[in-house]
């Protein structure tokens, strides 16, 4: 209880200059965060580059070259982490046959995502969180499966992040299930992620959030000349493509287009990531992805799951999707010497802190409602206990309608609360919290009478 009371955010007003935030960190999460190693991340990136190409249509039989050698090595590394975890991390290939598409898949191809599943310890908590990077690579010609395609930043960096998360987190126990994934065939059309998303849907996984770390190792922006190792972007969609007609009406009437599940997930990553990782500013980008680009979170978003993309702040396109060469004095190609491994470590730590805090937290409160039975300048909220672990209390979060992030948090021990703020002027949400300060995702209230 002492911890819980001390973590409450204290704000004298909504202007950022007048806010004071008390930071309290869970020691177990802090220990995990500090264990993330830039040396391990660099070692993984360089090993993946050593396979010469990880093109999804490349050699699957060689022990030293091509996509087959790469996936076998990733699996063996995850199995090594599993042994260190006492066998709790379950490692498998997620195998499927991708049909020819007349574009980037010339002939049917057996493809494999590599999964490390860390089962939750609470039988009543069926939440699943998926974190990934894609291990395939490409050069300038997307269909050239033989040319050297190092793919150090795109996306050995994200694969290394997911693997380092598996190494560290598999030594600990969490309420719910975590799945660490090295995705295949992102460059060919998000085929690995599409297969896994469909599997999750078909098998009834309760995917509460999916994160892809894609291009998380560069700190220099081409053309602008910006150098920034303190910022990272999180992309999230606002309006789900699977909205029901009722949800469309409710969104239009309440102005909740910025409060979809993916946006809440992204806000959570910003709040908790910045709580644990120093010198890191998480920028919330309110769109699904960049122009002309896509990522492995998209197939999950298209099936209604909360998918977000983590990617570097400034991009160098001379070192993405480029054949390695020197031309007019410019170095092209995605080589490991161009990766900022300390930066990738920061991004990995942000992932870890947010995932661990979520996976240790109680589930979200149920049937969260905002009372709209009459005209009033007060706001009345009520909700029901979450399934599973009983929280010690709840945070009611609040923000101005123009703010991208929650600005105030009020601790409430009950399942109802009344505030002297008008619901017409602010957005509200409710999240569960345990005695160690682990918060659930925020639930946006629905109108009740």
PLM regions: where:
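Short beta-strand segments within Ig-like beta-sandwich modules, predominantly Fibronectin type-III
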Residues: 407-414
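Active-site-adjacent mobile loop/cap segments within catalytic or ligand-binding domains
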Residues: 49, 216-237, 284-362
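Conserved aromatic anchor
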Residues: 377-390
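Beta-strand-rich modules
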Residues: 418-440
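A non-catalytic alpha/beta surface segment that caps or lines the substrate-entry region
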Residues: 43-119
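Alpha-helical metal-binding/catalytic segments enriched in His/Glu/Asp
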Residues: 116, 131-132, 136-137, 141-190, ...
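N-terminal capping segment at the start of a domain
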Residues: 20-66, 319, 326-334
């Amino acid at each position: 209880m002492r911890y819980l009371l001390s973590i409450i955010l204290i704000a004298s007003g909504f202007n950022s200059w007048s806010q004071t935030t008390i930071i309290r960190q869970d020691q177990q999460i802090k220990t995990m965060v500090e264990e993330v190693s830039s040396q391990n991340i660099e070692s993984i990136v360089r090993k993946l580059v050593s396979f010469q190409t990880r093109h999804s249509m490349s050699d699957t039989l060689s022990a030293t070259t091509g996509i087959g050698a790469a996936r076998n090595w990733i699996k063996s590394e995850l199995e090594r982490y599993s042994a260190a975890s006492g066998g709790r991390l379950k490692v498998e290939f997620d195998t499927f046959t991708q049909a020819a598409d007349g574009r980037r898949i010339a002939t049917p191809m057996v493809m494999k995502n590599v999964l490390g599943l860390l089962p939750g310890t609470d039988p009543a908590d069926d939440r699943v969180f998926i974190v990934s990077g894609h291990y395939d690579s490409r050069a300038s010609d997307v269909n050239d499966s033989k040319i050297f395609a190092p793919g150090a930043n795109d996306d050995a960096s994200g694969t290394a992040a997911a693997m380092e998360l598996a190494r560290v987190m598999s030594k600990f126990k969490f309420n719910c299930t975590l799945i660490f994934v090295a995705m295949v065939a992102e460059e060919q059309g998000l085929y690995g992620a599409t297969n896994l998303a469909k599997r999750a849907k078909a098998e009834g996984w309760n995917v509460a959030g999916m994160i892809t770390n894609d291009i998380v190792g560069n700190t220099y922006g081409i053309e602008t000349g910006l150098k920034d190792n303190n910022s990272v972007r999180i992309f999230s969609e606002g309006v789900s493509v699977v909205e029901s007609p009722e949800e469309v009406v409710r969104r239009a009437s309440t102005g909740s287009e910025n409060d979809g599940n993916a946006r809440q997930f992204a806000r959570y990553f910003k709040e908790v990531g910045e709580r644990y990782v120093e010198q890191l500013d998480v920028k919330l980008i309110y769109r699904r992805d960049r122009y002309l680009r896509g990522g492995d979170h998209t197939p999950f978003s298209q099936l209604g799951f909360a998918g977000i993309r983590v990617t570097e702040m400034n991009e160098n396109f001379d070192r993405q999707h480029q054949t390695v060469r020197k031309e007019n004095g410019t170095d092209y190609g995605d080589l490991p010497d161009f990766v900022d491994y300390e930066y990738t470590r920061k991004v990995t730590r942000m992932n870890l802190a947010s995932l661990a805090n979520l996976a240790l937290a109680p589930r979200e409160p149920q049937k969260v409602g905002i009372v709209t039975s009459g005209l009033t300048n007060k706001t009345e909220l009520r909700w029901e206990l979450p399934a599973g672990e009983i929280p010690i209390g709840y945070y009611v979060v609040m923000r101005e309608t123009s703010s991208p992030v929650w600005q105030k948090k009020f601790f409430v021990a009950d399942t109802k609360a009344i505030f002297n703020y008008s619901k017409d002027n602010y957005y509200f949400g409710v999240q569960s919290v345990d005695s160690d300060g682990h918060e659930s995702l925020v639930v946006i209230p629905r109108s009740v009478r």
